[in-house]
Amino acid sequence: MSDFELEKALAAWRRALRRNPALDDGEATELECGLRDEFEELVAGGMDPGSAFQRALDATGSAADCGPEFYRAKRTRRSARPPWQAPRLVPPLVWSYVLTAVRKVRREKGYAFINIAGLAVGLACSVLMMLWVRQETSFDRFHIDGGSIYRLVTETKGPSAVTRDARAPTPTGPAVKAEIPEVVDFCRYRTNKNYGIRLGDKALYDAVIGIADPSFFAMFTFPFLKGDPKTALGDPRSIVVTESVARTFFGADDPMGKVLTIIRDPYTVTGVIRDVPENSHLRFACVIPAVNMHEYHHVDFDSWNSMFFNCYVRLAPGASPAAAAAKMTRLVAGRLGRPNIGILAQPLKDVHLKSDFAFDLDNHARGSASTLTLLSLAAAAILLLACINFMNLATARSANRAKEVGLRKVTGARRSDIVRQFLNESVVLAFIGLALALLLLWAALPLFNGLAGESIAFAQLADPGLLAAVLAVTLLAGLLAGSYPAFYLAAFEPARVLKGNFFAGERGRAALRKGLVIVQFALTVFFIAGVLIVDKQLRFVRTKALGIDTRQVVTTTVRSERHREAVLADPRILAASISAPPGLAMRAAVDVAWDGKDPQDRTPFFPVPVDPGYLETFRAGMAEGRFFSRELASDRTDAVVVNQTAARVMGPGSPVGKRLTLTAMSMEGTTETRTYAVIGVMKDIHQSSLRRAIEPTIFTWDLGPWLNLRIDPNGVPETIAFLEKTWKSFVTEFPFTYEFLDDRYDAFYKQDRRTRSILGVFAALALFSACLGLVGLASFVAERRTKEIGIRKVLGASAHGLVLWQSWGFLAWVLAANIIALPAAYYAADRWLRSFAYRVEPGIGPALLAGAFSLAVAFLSVAYKAVQAARSNPIDSLRFE
């Protein structure tokens, strides 16, 4: 240690000490004096200089230790950590990257805002869709045996179309359990909202009552608070209620063994379950045994022509659903004697999202898998737009960081270090964007719930799995956004950068930016054009002639002809009909035969019960012949009217006068065969949404449970009050309920309107994100071309010409995006339009409107910066040249 040099060692320690931001010069000098004194004492004691200096240094403290100690001494909170020092759980290098990213945000606020705002919007949309997807895909997942439960769907193949019915023939469940080994159990189920539940003066008239086989609670997992799920529905007059219903009628008392009244019959409470979860397609306030339907609706449980229930089966472990469905098809088709009948096994988990069948349960809002997929892709596209903005602006402004990269490389940084630094910076910005995204989501979630008809709660984000997915998406977005800039900047050659030759090869970078802008606006134009085409179709379905006038028609339930006559006594009631109103799900198909019918023709005909007031009430028209008349008693028993579609199926020539033989297959199980004479042909009526083609229909004089009234458009509230008063004179145990016919037709397209609205919002957000990026690029170009603009102004260029010159390049990119996006948008829209039997031709209008709008918005985005640059004084940019 004889060659130890004290001054050199002190100089090195002093330099490290003075780099510490917690120490001022006086404190550093004081520490140095203390170190010298300690060193001299140790040397005087006989220690060699090198060891003495090390011992003194240990006693005084290293430069890294002294800084935090002095920092804490100056703070009232003794545990405070210096802001430049990494938190205890964060590696120092990562903390350095975080600080660099924060400084960059402070230094370039405008560009940081564009990046963070874009990422925040994209992440907010993505997190929203993750919440929605999680909620929609959680339906019916809580049942213990849910993976082996299937709903049976009846498929009927006609000559031109295939119809699917969510019900199955009533005896299907017992038959398949007895004859098909794969079927372990079955349960038939349906709901009714018209029975009501009563106990003395208390009543729940609008309660949804489930009607099921005794196996219902053994097959489906609804936790019991009281009672035995295996025996709860064993007695025909037993009832299982939810805890809310039990609380409503019995308060804190034990409901077991108590009696509730449904219709006029007593039912004994044999079980209490927890309230049905929101994510269940089986929704009810109580459940009663299905056997009562023989009494209430004359259901024939042994008739294969009876279609009254949804039927669920539970398959054995390892059983093939396809093989079981094939066996069930053979069984049902054989019992019915109809080879065009098939049975599909729909997984329980698919019922909520993948059900577009006739006679489906209508007491819950069905979802749409295609809508969910479409909106998820839209959210992902908006996030991609934000990532493209980040890439574009980072590469465009790479000149500002070129020397930093060059110096880092000269001082020993490897390429991987540079890549890691820039990736970390982009990830930090992504997580800052996530924080802002969560604030946006919290504020916007109530608006989205109202728009989509959902009940998504912000608190659902506390779910560990979902939270992990959100963090993973944010991390991936940060890595994606920073990937190209990181590798691009890391590839800089220090010598060329430090010599000022950075802009060599700018043409390649400009081409990349051009491509990314085109991708951005292509996605945006795709959304805009798609929304415009969807809107055009929805306007078409709203204005298309339906064959009837749905305005000012009120539908309610009816008890008798006397009820109809009582309301007709009021002059505000213009017409009345006891019939199945248009817009209601049609009855089960009937077999129809006539002279000359092709034996291979299996076209289903659908019966509709009407009375002579039907034409006047709904303002339908006759194409040929006449309608039913109260003056002719034979019309009630021997006559039918067919629609134009049925007349075409029956062949050329007039069907009036022909004899039709009907074999009924009603939901009550009627199998009677009768012959009628065709007395007229009614003009076609759209009985359902325009997604379905008009079916061959037979109108019979057969009173239904609905009273349809055409009312005077003046004084509607008074008319409704009169109808309620009249109702109460006939019915005392149930409240008066009614529905306007146009509301029922309007509900057919409720989901489509919601999808259009959400897509419209997403299109606006996509446009916002794309324009943010365009504004950033325009600012960069204006900065880069400041001297060129000054020279052009000196040479006589006008401000107007300079604005067009600067804007043209961007507009050309947007025009190219239109050329790419519009064909794709029309193709996607055509696929959606095919779901409608009656649809509009998109035409060129949406393309022109989307193109013009995108070009106009793009021009306005770049024009602001272009005008600023064009109006600048050329002296400011050329004074030093």
Task: Pin down the residues of each PLM region.
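Mid-to-C-terminal secondary-structure elements
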Residues: N194, G210-K226, R237-S370, E565-Q751
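Negatively charged linear elements and acidic catalytic determinants
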Residues: M1-R107, A504, P874-E881
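Membrane-helix entry/capping segments
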Residues: G67-Y111, H143, D302-N305, T329-A381, ...
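Alpha-helical transmembrane segments of integral membrane proteins
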Residues: R81-F113, L361-H364, L393-F431, W442-R559, ...
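Interfacial "coupling" helices/loops that link adjacent transmembrane helices in transporter permeases
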Residues: K109, A386-V428, G773-L811, K865-Q868, ...
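Hydrophobic, regular-secondary-structure patches
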Residues: E136, D145-V208, S215, S244-A252, ...
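Small-residue-rich transmembrane alpha-helices
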Residues: A124, L128-L131, L344, V427-V497, ...
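A hydrophobic alpha-helix feature that marks transmembrane segments and, especially
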Residues: V127-M130, L377-V405, L480-A486, L532, ...
